[in-house]
UniProtKB/Swiss-Prot annotation:
Species per Swiss-Prot/TrEMBL record: Candida albicans (strain SC5314 / ATCC MYA-2876) (Yeast)
GO CC entries: mitochondrial inner membrane; plasma membrane; respiratory chain complex I
Location(s) in or outside the cell: Mitochondrion inner membrane
Statement: the UniProt record of this protein carries the keyword Membrane: yes
InterPro entries, A to Z: NADH_UbQ_FeS_4_mit-like (IPR006885), NDUFS4-like_sf (IPR038532)
Protein name: NADH dehydrogenase [ubiquinone] iron-sulfur protein 4, mitochondrial
Keyword Mitochondrion: yes
Native organism taxonomy: Eukaryota, Fungi, Dikarya, Ascomycota, Saccharomycotina
Purpose: Accessory subunit of the mitochondrial membrane respiratory chain NADH dehydrogenase (Complex I), that is believed not to be involved in catalysis. Complex I functions in the transfer of electrons from NADH to the respiratory chain. The immediate electron acceptor for the enzyme is believed to be ubiquinone. Involved in osmotic stress resistance and thermotolerance.
Protein family: Belongs to the complex I NDUFS4 subunit family.
An example Gene Ontology biological process: electron transport chain
Entry superkingdom: Eukaryota
UniProt transit peptide range: 1-17
């Protein structure tokens, strides 16, 4: 909790804020994990530190010829087990206790995504994008001679 403390009665610009001594030293050390990193999100420790994340680059959409979102690397979380999913009886919707399930983070480079995951203390694995193979097709290939029997194509 912050309280306003006036040091001297000088002009208004010299007033400062000071924190009260509500937080004890034991509470400050309880907020850090074993590696010395501070957990500030307020989430349970097992959900914050023991997560596995996937780092990948999104594939090109099959219905378009452009490379939309192909330059970004994404980070998302694996699905938790332990009964953290359920189905709504009335509508049949899927529910989850995992608050990070629908969260996807974008990064400019793979290295920055890996560094972020390591700084958060998450285990990670990287899915490298599959290389696209471009095969040149000619219209004349439809009329090449084949040694086998002729194809009979039925239209009706």
């Amino acid at each position: 909790m912050l309280s306003r403390v006036s040091i001297r009665s000088l002009p208004l610009c010299t007033r400062t804020f000071a924190t009260t001594s509500i937080l004890k030293q034991s509470e400050l050390t309880a907020a850090t994990d074993s590696s010395g990193k501070e957990i500030v999100s307020g989430a349970p420790r097992e959900l914050v530190t023991e997560r596995v994340v996937r780092i990948y680059q999104e594939a090109k959409p099959a219905t378009q010829s452009g490379h939309h979102n192909g330059s970004h690397w994404k980070l998302d979380w694996d699905v938790l087990g332990k009964g953290n999913r359920w189905e709504n009886d009335l509508m049949g919707y899927q529910g989850s206790a995992d608050y990070m399930q629908g969260t996807i983070m974008k990064f400019d480079t793979k290295e920055s995504a890996i560094k972020f995951a390591e700084n958060q203390g998450w285990d990670h694995y990287v899915q490298e994008p599959k290389k696209r193979h471009f095969r040149k097709k000619d219209y004349s290939a439809n009329f090449y001679h084949s040694a086998g029997p002729l194809k009979h194509i039925r239209t009706k």
